Amino acid sequence: VLTEEDKSRVRAAWGPVSKNAELYGAETLTRLFTAYPATKTYFHHFDLSPGSSNLKTHGKKVIDAITEAVNNLDDVAGALSKLSDLHAQKLRVDPVNFKLLGHCLEVTIAAHNGGPLKPEVILSLDKFLCLVAKTLVSRYR
């Protein structure tokens, strides 16, 4: 459960991410595909080289979707409902990939922070991204 402090920290940390969605998204996906090559399975039709237009476009979609969740922290499930359905029913993405994506996103945010993230910010982001992952896999049952 996100506390009011968590929500405030998530919103603050997310500002630069949402303003640079393509950059953060592409970099996060590059990290994901590098660290966890099995996740490439769903993107066989993409050019997965760093900086490719495919990574930029899809990365922006990912960040924009998570931004929608940030904008609806009191109803993350509602904000991600259609996306959850899509990934569970049509795309059939392995649910573990959402946790991996969240981890790579946290690393990307930290890398662009200009210094270490405060522990309480890391905790709040982690709680939020775990909630996002949990929400996205909720339709798998």
UniProtKB/Swiss-Prot annotation:
GO BP, sorted A to Z: hydrogen peroxide catabolic process
**Residues at which heme b binds:** H87
Q: Which organism is it from?
A: Drymarchon melanurus erebennus (Texas indigo snake)
Protein's job: Involved in oxygen transport from the lung to the various peripheral tissues.
Q: What is this protein called?
A: Hemoglobin subunit alpha-A
Q: Does the keyword Transmembrane apply?
A: no
Do you know which InterPro entries this protein is assigned to?
Globin, Globin-like_sf, Globin/Proto, Hemoglobin_a-typ, Hemoglobin_oxygen_transport, Hemoglobin_pi
What are the entry keywords?
A: Heme, Iron, Metal-binding, Oxygen transport, Transport
| Record domain Globin: where | 1-141
Subunit = Heterotetramer of two alpha chains and two beta chains.
SUPFAM superfamilies associated with the record: Globin-like (SSF46458)
Keyword flag Protein biosynthesis = no
